């Protein structure tokens, strides 16, 4: 199925019973796979790059892998926060100790927004899937997933005409976060990829 047919499939897409069966099958497959997915050896951009051009069940499997990577990241951050809190309460309440703890807390707070350089020079080195542009876009969309709620699902492109990117779609009047594949389609849109960059315009947009 094409990306536009993911919800219904391309065989009898008007049959509600078949659509329901398809969704149940996909849900069961993803549930079974999620428990056995090992993501420790995978970088976010590797998953995102494959998801960008995936179709059919490959899309579902890669999305399950992506979600597991996001879950593991949040799990790791919570562990780090707990360790920091324990270290902070067990250490002396000196000014320097408090400042160190506050700085570390800010570092794992998730208050960040990714910026991806999508200019032409990012495509000159490496092989597809591991070029600078693949790493930049993949990590940027991953950051948009794991950022704090108020910074989540957004990013900026760094090119001749920098743009603010939204990774939210409207379904039935509701705002729904995009999948990894959909996020990559937005950030890799050929209409915004350019050959030059404009750092001043980017700063103005962010500010």
Report the location of each language-model feature:
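Long lumenal/extracellular ectodomains of secretory and single-pass membrane proteins
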Residues: 1-135, 145-207
């Amino acid at each position: 199925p094409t990306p536009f047919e993911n919800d219904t499939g391309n065989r009898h897409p008007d049959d509600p019973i078949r659509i329901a069966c398809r969704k149940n099958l996909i849900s069961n497959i993803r549930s079974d796979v999620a428990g056995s997915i090992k993501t420790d050896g995978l970088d976010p951009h590797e998953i995102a790059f494959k998801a960008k051009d995936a179709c059919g069940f490959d899309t579902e499997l890669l999305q399950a892998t992506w979600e597991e990577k996001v879950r593991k990241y949040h799990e790791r951050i919570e562990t780090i926060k707990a360790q920091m809190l324990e270290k902070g309460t067990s250490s002396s309440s000196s000014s320097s100790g408090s400042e160190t703890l506050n700085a570390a807390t800010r570092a794992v707070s998730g208050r960040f927004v990714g910026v991806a350089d999508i200019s032409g020079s990012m495509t000159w080195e490496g092989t597809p899937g591991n070029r600078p542009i693949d790493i930049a876009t993949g990590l940027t969309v991953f950051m948009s997933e794991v950022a704090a709620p108020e910074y989540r699902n957004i990013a900026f492109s760094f090119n001749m005409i920098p743009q603010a990117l939204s990774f939210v779609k409207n379904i039935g009047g509701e705002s729904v976060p995009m999948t990894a594949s959909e996020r990559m389609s937005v950030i890799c849109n050929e209409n915004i990829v350019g050959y030059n960059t404009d750092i001043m315009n980017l700063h103005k947009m962010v500010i």
